[in-house]
């Protein structure tokens, strides 16, 4: 494995990361939003802020996002699985947390650009402040930096990080192809469609959590099953909040962005398999017309689809109660009517 000693080029990581997006977004309740001028999207509006506000802003898009979420976002999980790591190996402790932050936040930065999102945790998205070009470049710079640090300090962790990035981007690539080509590229029915969606989610989201276990265990797979299941729960939870949580929509400034973008989610797959809602969903995903999307949102919020999603979410959480509590995503979802 002599390649571990070589530096990873910025260009290669940029190519890997260009399609990545990990965040979970929502649109406004009317499924519409004002269009930002192209110049604002490209260059941001930080320069237009007052000097006082500009001086208070974080120095780069990554630090801005960290200021919203908090640094060392995975610390509670690290302490749960290895409570003595900070004391026994402080260098590894810091490296693991920096790797997890870098992957999580860098992919969110790119995701918000690709989804043209305006808000995250009730704050403007980074690319609206710093511009899309600087935001994407900073994401790649952060990833490249943490990869090179890992390869220098703990080569085994660097190898795990590179493999995880490949799997995450493979999952995201599947999702983006389905979004680009529509249902002609997702020709699955019934249980097969759910399995295909879960496979994508396992790569895109499950890998992020599996990576944490691999880093803590120096490449060991002892936590793979547990953290893969938790990754599925996290994906499912965010898919459901995207449709069913008013609180989540407020924090994101929008509702049902997956639907509007033509991106598949678990509720959408369930609705596609329901005879009473399948045609409505197919029409909305094909046309993207406002009236069709509004009708599809009503179908997603219908009792059969909502109940099926809530059952799946409850089943996915079994045995993961402590991890769910530590992860701390607590936005409420509307009860069935």
From Swiss-Prot:
Pathway: Secondary metabolite biosynthesis. Mg(2+) 1 binds at residues 111, 115. The keyword Isomerase does not apply. The keyword Magnesium applies. Gene3D superfamilies: Farnesyl Diphosphate Synthase. GO terms for biological process: alcohol biosynthetic process; isoprenoid biosynthetic process; mycotoxin biosynthetic process. Keywords: Magnesium, Metal-binding, Transferase. One of its GO terms (molecular function) is prenyltransferase activity. Disruption phenotype: The disruption of the whole terpendoles biosynthesis cluster abolishes the terpendoles production. Its EC number is 2.5.1.-. Mg(2+) 2 binds at residues 111, 115. Binds 3 Mg(2+) ions per subunit. Its cofactor is Mg(2+). Belongs to the FPP/GGPP synthase family. Prenyltransferase; part of the gene cluster that mediates the biosynthesis of terpendoles, indole-diterpene (IDT) mycotoxins including terpendole I, terpendole K, terpendole C, as well as the kinesin Eg5 inhibitor terpendole E. Terpendoles biosynthesis begins with the synthesis of geranylgeranyl diphosphate (GGPP) by a yet unidentified GGPP synthase. This is Prenyltransferase terC. The gene is terC.
